[in-house]
């Protein structure tokens, strides 16, 4: 699902093709791992070639990665069915070639320096500009698109959604390891990805015109050539009429993914409806947003997060309990009550970063066992 493909008009305006309904779509990145060694396999091109033309299966920056995307869906349940139907034949092709599908924010022991770049001008240009940091982007994530009706709502919703940034990152955190070492972080991916010059947290804009001026400035100064080079953790997708949430580490299974998609869908639709009701959405000071991102990346579900401009704090899982209760009416309207109810399973059973560390401990630090465990979680 290509994002931000629409470009600016000569007058600097960016058309946002509003969504009539609050639809949802998902992009899910997978790594290919060798069935025996559990190291990464740079065979995505041959896998995609064997699958043939399929608008639901895409190549990515590195040759060890395939991305599976949905169409336009009504809710999280429909999106999961869409993904599963695409993944079944993809996994069959992958297994026939002696590999497995793997998803986490990072691979626990792979060497980033030996990974191969997908042959495409935009990827070559990215590496040419970003050099060492760009070559280290051995990371995988999930992107969730939610339809929004009008451009004037987009920036207030994105800015307000930053209140829930740490909740979403902590729940999905799945990248404790890097190059064979435990980083001490729940999400090392979040710290890695923000090193790219146009990645990281979005600016606190309130008006669509501010975003248009920002894009114009970025192009005028040569920072970007196209809007898809804006790699914010939450960004507008004008040609799709969506807000794209890119906070999540890679997710290994449909159960957790359905919960995260439902939560994201409900959060954005709730903010959209509050705007319709004439409410001014809350704004978190950017220094608190930045700190919350770091706390969630470092401590995951044990993070004490900052709640508001008054600097009140709370354990993220306690705040999630209240948030889920508040979103119940929205979930009923979107027919995703069941999927939203799975969110507490993540912090009751352990998030991916916690499960990975448990497996490593049980196997005397053998990180191949971590890959085994993550691969086995993908039940279709």
From Swiss-Prot:
Catalyzed reactions:
L-cysteine + L-glutamate + ATP = gamma-L-glutamyl-L-cysteine + ADP + phosphate + H(+)
Biological process (GO), any one: modified amino acid biosynthetic process
> According to the UniProt record, what class of enzyme is this?
ligase
- Alphabetical list of InterPro entries matching this protein: GCL_type2/YbdK_subfam, GCS2, Gln_synth/guanido_kin_cat_dom, YbdK
> Key word ATP-binding present in the record?
yes
Q: Name one Pfam family in it.
A: GCS2
Q: What does this protein do?
A: ATP-dependent carboxylate-amine ligase which exhibits weak glutamate--cysteine ligase activity.
Q: Which family does it belong to?
A: Belongs to the glutamate--cysteine ligase type 2 family. YbdK subfamily.
Name of protein: Putative glutamate--cysteine ligase 2-1
């Amino acid at each position: 699902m290509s994002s931000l493909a629409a470009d600016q008009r000569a007058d600097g305006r960016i058309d946002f093709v509003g969504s009539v309904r609050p639809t949802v779509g998902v992009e899910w990145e997978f790594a290919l791992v060798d069935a025996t060694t559990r190291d990464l396999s740079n065979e995505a091109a041959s896998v995609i070639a064997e699958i043939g033309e399929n608008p639901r299966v895409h190549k990515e920056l590195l040759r060890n990665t395939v991305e599976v995307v949905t169409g336009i869906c009504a809710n999280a349940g429909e999106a999961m069915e869409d993904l599963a139907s695409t993944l079944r034949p993809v996994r069959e092709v992958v297994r026939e070639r002696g590999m497995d599908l793997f998803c986490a924010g990072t691979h626990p022991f792979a060497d980033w320096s030996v990974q191969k770049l997908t042959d495409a001008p935009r990827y070559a240009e990215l590496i040419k500009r970003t050099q060492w940091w760009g070559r280290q982007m051995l990371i995988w994530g999930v992107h969730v698109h939610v339809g929004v009706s009008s451009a004037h709502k987009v920036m207030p919703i994105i800015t307000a959604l930053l209140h829930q940034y740490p909740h979403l990152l902590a729940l999905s955190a799945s990248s404790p390891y890097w190059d064979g070492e435990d980083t001490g972080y729940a999400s090392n991916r979040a710290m890695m990805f923000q090193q790219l010059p146009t990645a990281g947290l979005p600016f606190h804009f309130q008006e669509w015109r501010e975003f248009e001026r920002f894009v114009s400035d970025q192009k005028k100064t040569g920072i970007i050539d196209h809007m898809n080079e804006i790699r914010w953790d939450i960004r507008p997708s004008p040609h799709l009429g969506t807000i794209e949430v890119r906070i999540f580490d890679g997710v290994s299974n449909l159960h957790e993914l359905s919960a995260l998609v439902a939560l994201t869908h409900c959060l954005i639709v709730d903010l959209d409806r509050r705007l319709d009701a004439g409410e001014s959405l809350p704004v978190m000071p950017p220094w608190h947003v930045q700190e919350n991102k770091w706390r969630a990346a470092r401590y995951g579900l044990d993070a004490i997060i900052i709640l508001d401009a008054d600097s009140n704090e709370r354990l993220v899982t306690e705040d999630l309990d209240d948030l889920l209760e508040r979103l119940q009416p929205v979930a009923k309207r979107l027919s995703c009550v069941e999927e939203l109810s799975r969110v507490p399973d993540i912090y009751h059973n352990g998030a991916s970063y916690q499960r990975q560390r448990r497996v490593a401990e049980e196997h005397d630090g053998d990180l191949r066992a971590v890959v085994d465990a993550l691969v086995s979680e993908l039940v279709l």
